A protein has these predicted regions:
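Hydrophobic transmembrane alpha-helices and their helix-loop junctions in integral membrane proteins
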Residues: 94-112, 118-137, 147-435
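Cytoplasmic/organellar membrane-interface segments at the starts of transmembrane helices
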Residues: 371-376, 426, 430-484
């Protein structure tokens, strides 16, 4: 049995080792393609070991260097970090397998470069998850941005380069102009950047200034895709579908909402936010983003574009839970990181599988195609039901807890927002399924079988189902997060 110190080293370094070895393993494509899934399994085992220790009340730590008095380069795993680490490492296994099938099926160029940067992105996500303070989080948040740029621009077309410029300008711009000053503000006000249970800003900053500091964090974390800092996400859909899965489920956007939740719980403290009302404005902005992005999603005929706006909406569920700042709402937001990851990666896997097997990208082209690709469309159906929040799928737990949190905190209007959002979700997520299974075929295409792009979405769809029945482990970590 490995020690916690060893487990943390393995969890942080295994993806980096995969990235370094990938160019050398490319002499045999099968070696290169096996490195990602194997690295994912190793990283996930380490993440499970660390998460179990956190559940037992420990705080696994890995000290690297002392930078200044009260400021260290250190990793320390919180219950929230343990959850994000499990999501990032666990889904990397299936995403790596899927990437092999997708890249081979489409005969994509630069597959070695793609696999290497994919692993670097997972390394950065794990470091963000296990960061011990705001400095470490900020550094690896930036590394995650830069490591995903080559993935977004992978096709090297003019459209991809334009998307890459927008991606970098928004994510780097917001982090440097807004997030970094917020981190400096916390340091100057408190003399520390550590994460502490219950937060520590109460009594350290003027309550009247708390909404401004929170705004710097909320908009500085561009990866959370709050409106109007959201345009990078739909633009990034020009990337190959495995990148979309990485952006939407495994690493990038989850790093964004993870950062906001971390700041709310471990820096501000939910009691401080609730007592001062400093996050009230964020509740309403999140509600607006939830509905506005859902309405935009309805207008999109491109499958990935529709899913992109769905992601913007679902991310704001998590921000909403953080902003409500009650125990049950924060737990619901935390669980939604897990549930949305499983459901949304299923949907993107299915979108990519349809493209690889039939070269279809438009919802209007899917009429009758469900009978040609039943496993893919069935997986899409299950993933959609989880995102909508219908039992017995995992997404129903997190949405239920968010609704309870809204009512308990007196936000009755938010209950209506969540209900309306679910109705909109039903419309725009189930349309591809209804077209695929229940409409006559309008376009005859040759469907080629590619098991490596079909098996992963089926497995993640099953995961979305299992998460409904086996939610206790994640729920216990989420509860520990707000009572520790």
């Amino acid at each position: 049995m490995m020690s916690l110190h060893t487990a943390m080293l393995v969890g942080l370094l295994a993806p980096l080792v995969v990235a370094i070895l990938t160019p050398f393993l490319a002499v045999r494509h099968v070696w290169r393609d096996a490195a990602g899934p194997i690295g994912g399994v190793i990283t996930f085992i380490a993440a499970v070991h660390v998460a179990l220790a956190v559940l037992d009340g420990e705080t696994p730590r890995l000290f690297v260097a002392q930078i200044a008095e009260g400021l260290a380069l250190e990793f320390a795993v919180t219950p929230l970090g343990a959850i994000f680490g499990l999501v990032a490492s666990g889904l990397w296994i299936l995403a790596a397998l899927y990437s092999v099938g997708y890249m081979r099926g489409n005969h994509e160029k630069h597959q070695t470069r793609f696999a290497a940067f994919y692993a670097v992105a997972v390394h950065a996500a794990m470091a963000v998850a296990w960061s011990g303070n705001l400095l470490v989080l900020f550094v690896f948040y930036e590394i995650l941005t830069f490591s995903t740029y080559p993935l977004v621009t992978h096709k090297e077309s003019a459209l991809a380069r334009n998307a890459g410029r927008l991606y970098m300008s928004i994510l780097v711009g917001t982090s440097v102009v807004l997030l970094l000053p917020a981190v400096v503000w916390v340091w100057l006000s408190t003399g520390t950047l550590d994460f502490r249970p219950g937060g520590y800003l109460a009594g350290q900053i003027d309550p009247a200034m708390a909404p401004i500091l929170l705004a710097l964090f909320a908009f500085g974390v561009g990866k959370a895709a709050l409106m109007p800092i959201h345009r990078w996400l739909p633009a990034a859909m020009v990337a190959p579908t495995p990148v979309s899965a990485l952006l939407h489920a495994v690493a990038v956007v989850k790093a964004g909402v993870f950062t906001i939740l971390t700041v709310v719980v471990y820096v501000f403290g939910i009691d401080f936010l609730a007592e001062t009302g400093a996050a009230d404005w964020l509740v309403w902005l999140s509600a607006f983003t939830i509905l506005a992005s859902s309405m935009v999603a309805i207008t999109k005929d491109d499958v990935k574009a529709r899913l992109a706006y769905s992601t913007i909406s679902q991310l704001s569920y998590i921000v909403l839970g953080a902003a409500i700042a009650s125990s049950i709402a924060v737990q619901g937001a935390t669980l939604h990181i897990v549930m949305h990851a499983a459901g949304k990666i299923t949907l993107f896997f299915c979108a990519g599988a349809i493209y690889v097997q039939a070269h279809l990208t438009k919802i209007s082209e899917l009429d009758g195609q469900g009978r040609e690709m039943p496993w893919v469309f069935a997986a899409f159906f299950i993933g959609a039901l989880s995102i909508i929040g219908i039992p017995p799928l995992g997404g129903s737990w997190s949405k239920f807890m968010l609704m309870v949190g809204a009512v308990d905190s007196g936000y009755l209007v938010i209950l209506g927002v969540l209900g309306l959002s679910s109705l909109l979700n039903i419309y725009y997520l189930l349309e591809p399924v209804s077209r695929g299974f229940f409409r006559p075929k309008v376009k005859t295409v040759e469907v080629t079988s590619h098991p490596l792009v079909v098996i992963p979405p089926v497995l993640t769809a099953i995961l979305s189902l299992l998460l409904f029945f086996y939610v206790d482990f994640f729920a216990a970590l989420a509860k520990l997060m707000v009572i520790s």
